[in-house]
Amino acid sequence: MRRGRLTAAALAAGALGGACATWPMHAVPIGTAAAAECAPRDTRPGPRPEWARAKRATILVDSVLLGGVPALRTELRGWRTATVGRPAIMLPAAEAAIRSGGRVAPLAIVGVGYNSLWERGRRNYAGWAERFDDGARGLVRALRARGARQVVWVTLRDAGRGVIPSGALWQFDAYAWYFPYVNERLRRLDRIRDDLVLAEWDRVSKRTGITYDAIHLNPRGAALMARTIRAAIEAEADAQRPPPPCPPETATARS
């Protein structure tokens, strides 16, 4: 997720402002200089980041996202994708798979976290959270070391019993209690990293008819997850575009 950062440009601007304090000043009507310098084309933002323009993605899966890969490939038409992972994979094994594999694409789409260890009622939560955080950070480091420049991590489904198929309520009762714990840790990771953004499956999956059990996708759910991931990619790619040289209100047509 992109956040406010103190950039080198801002530091340079501050230093220049101090240096210019003693320069001669000339009064210019507000907007005159900007209008003279800006053309309509100058109001367009800069290009998308390289990771988005490359249109190559590595998809790291457990059984949930694995079921959505065909729909995701359809949604990402024009992208080259490779899938890594397996059902029931845990974070340490996912990191090992990345480190022992080949080059990772500039965009990594991560759909793991269902297979993690916790205790009910937040018992020993701090210790289990630290363990999860270490695993998640290690995985992101491995992805970066292998070539990823942007990570999109899919959150876990966090829905009530009322939207779960009746035959899968046992699964919901056995496992779904810790899915919010995982999402809490992923949101924390998102807050502290500029190279990671969340595809918020937990927010869009609170509905019926998208899974055949508590978590695994049916075709409708696979299509919804694919759209959710694509939306996260598009939003982050646009957010990372450099701002236009001139605000739209200062642009004037040139003959």
Predicted segments, located by residue:
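Substrate-gating cap/lid alpha-helix
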Residues: 160-200, 219
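Histidine-centered active-site loop/cap adjacent to the catalytic His
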Residues: 94, 210-255
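Extracytoplasmic/secreted cell-surface and envelope-processing proteins
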Residues: 67-68, 117-125, 161-166, 206-212
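Extracytoplasmic/secreted proteins, especially bacterial periplasmic and envelope-associated proteins
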Residues: 59, 67, 71, 93, ...
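N-terminal secretory targeting modules
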Residues: 1-58, 236-255
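Active-site segments of SGNH/GDSL-like serine hydrolases
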Residues: 111-117, 142-176
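Conserved SGNH/GDSL esterase-like catalytic core that processes O-acyl groups on lipids
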Residues: 37-134
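Sec-exported extracytoplasmic/periplasmic mature domains
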Residues: 77, 102, 113, 141-148, ...
